Swiss-Prot record:
SUPFAM superfamilies: Thiolase-like
Pathway(s) this gene product operates in, as recorded in its UniProt entry: Metabolic intermediate biosynthesis; (R)-mevalonate biosynthesis; (R)-mevalonate from acetyl-CoA: step 1/3
Transmembrane segments: none
Keywords: Acyltransferase, Cytoplasm, PHA biosynthesis, Transferase
Organism domain of life: Bacteria
Taxonomic source organism: Chromobacterium violaceum (strain ATCC 12472 / DSM 30191 / JCM 1249 / CCUG 213 / NBRC 12614 / NCIMB 9131 / NCTC 9757 / MK)
One function term, GO molecular function aspect: acetyl-CoA C-acetyltransferase activity
UniProt keyword Transferase, yes or no: yes
UniProt family annotation: Belongs to the thiolase-like superfamily. Thiolase family.
Recorded catalytic activity of this chain's protein: 2 acetyl-CoA = acetoacetyl-CoA + CoA
The protein, known as: Acetyl-CoA acetyltransferase
One GO cellular component term: cytoplasm
Enzyme nomenclature, EC number: 2.3.1.9
Length: 392
């Protein structure tokens, strides 16, 4: 038995405090779930389960994936799982969906991720017991739970500085990489390349009809080498990582619909791709950005492929430094990696990004007739995740 992905959709990505800032993550997830069902004609009651990544769940209520399922109109008898594997959540969800199908535990699974970084709350630790005297400090759950290394108590940006130091990757190289990402994303957006993968989100307005949010708003169409060079280091006084060569803080959702190839034939659905290998691996938390190296090698080994066999790659750009470090280790060229720009330009809604890179990969593979593709991400805390797919 093999597992097929028969549909792949995402929302447009919102900037921090931007167009999607008031839309809770489960609503973003529900929008994508509904789109997958409409696209395929699969009946809501035929979905075996839903698995969605979400990292920032504080204040989101019980089991946000289940909320998305209910909001999307699936039966209450359908189970859902919310997954937190930090930046890898949305792709690990696809792994688990494939495993459920291969094990015979599920027929049809929707998997992906959702995130509203804009709505992540601040918390007041210790407040349950009260404060008898002195000041108390609020903790930003977005920074604490999403962007801070739990083992070294420093920001993900420091791990990027560590990778830059390890591989000798300078500021100019990082900025040049980032400019290319922005230019590619801007060109892709102007050419309408993201149109098929994006499902509009209806954003309520104070007056009048809702507005359809249907275009990635984080892309910097006016990005320039001079502009990037003027930015100060964000994490170390003498560092090389800046706001311009790092990914953003964003909102969005993405999901795919999976089933066995036999089930796809039975329903008359043509697979976008067949899953050929996948992996979740670990590395040193201090250099978490190189996680895709071991994950890619393991996934490719399971598929029986080499890096040279790949026609197209979507590798999440958490930071230019880590993306360049991964490229140096794996030896892949920029001609087949993130051809429409990456997270530095598009943004990085952490719980959704794992599936976002897969959705973008699958649509570009269709467009150019690519046969073999790979989606991969680094994961805060020191892990990597990868998925190898092949068009039938």
């Amino acid at each position: 038995m093999e597992v097929a992905i028969v549909a792949a959709q995402r929302t447009a990505i919102g900037s921090f405090g931007g167009g999607l800032a008031k839309i809770p993550a489960p609503e973003l997830g529900a929008t994508v779930i509904k789109a997958l069902l409409e696209k395929t004609g699969v009946k809501p009651e035929d979905v075996s389960e839903v698995i969605l990544g979400q990292v920032l769940t504080a204040g989101s209520g019980q089991n946000p994936a289940r909320q998305a399922l209910i909001k999307a109109g699936l039966p209450v008898t359908t189970p859902a799982t919310t997954l937190n594997v930090v930046c890898g959540s949305g792709l690990r969800a696809v792994h688990l969906a494939a495993q459920a199908i291969l094990a015979g535990d599920a027929d049809i699974v929707i998997a992906g991720g959702q995130e509203s970084m804009s709505l992540s709350p601040h918390i007041l630790p210790g407040s349950r017991d009260g404060f008898r005297m002195g000041n108390a400090q609020l903790v930003d759950t977005m920074v604490n739970d999403g962007l801070t290394d739990a083992y070294n108590a420093y920001h993900m940006g420091i791990t990027a500085e560590n990778v830059a130091a390890k591989y000798g990757i300078g500021r100019e190289e990082q900025d040049a990489f980032s400019l290319q990402s922005q230019q590619r994303a801007a060109a892709a957006q102007k050419a309408g390349k993201f149109r098929d993968e994006i499902v509009p989100v209806l954003v309520p307005q104070r007056k009048g009809d809702p507005l359809a949010f249907d275009a990635d708003e984080f892309i910097k169409h006016d990005a320039s080498a001079d502009g990037l060079a003027k930015l100060r280091p964000a994490f170390k006084k003498d560092g090389t990582v800046t706001a311009g060569n790092a990914s953003g803080i964003n909102d969005g959702a993405a999901a795919v619909l999976l089933m066995s190839t036999q089930k796809a034939d039975q329903l008359g659905l043509k697979p976008l791709a067949i899953i050929k290998g996948y992996a979740l691996t670990g590395c040193e938390p201090e250099i978490m950005g190189i996680g895709p190296v071991s994950a890619t090698r393991k996934a490719l080994s399971k598929a029986g492929w080499t890096v040279e066999d790949l026609d197209l790659v979507e590798a999440n750009e958490a930071f230019a430094a880590q993306a360049l470090g991964v490229a140096k280790e794996l030896g892949w060229g920029s001609d087949k990696v993130n051809v429409n720009g990456g997270a530095i330009a598009l943004g990085h809604p952490i719980g959704a990004s794992g599936c976002r890179v897969l959705v973008t990969l699958l649509h570009e593979m269709q467009r150019r007739g690519a046969k073999k593709g790979l989606a991969t991400l680094c994961i805060g805390g020191g892990m990597g995740v990868a998925l190898a797919v092949e068009r039938p």
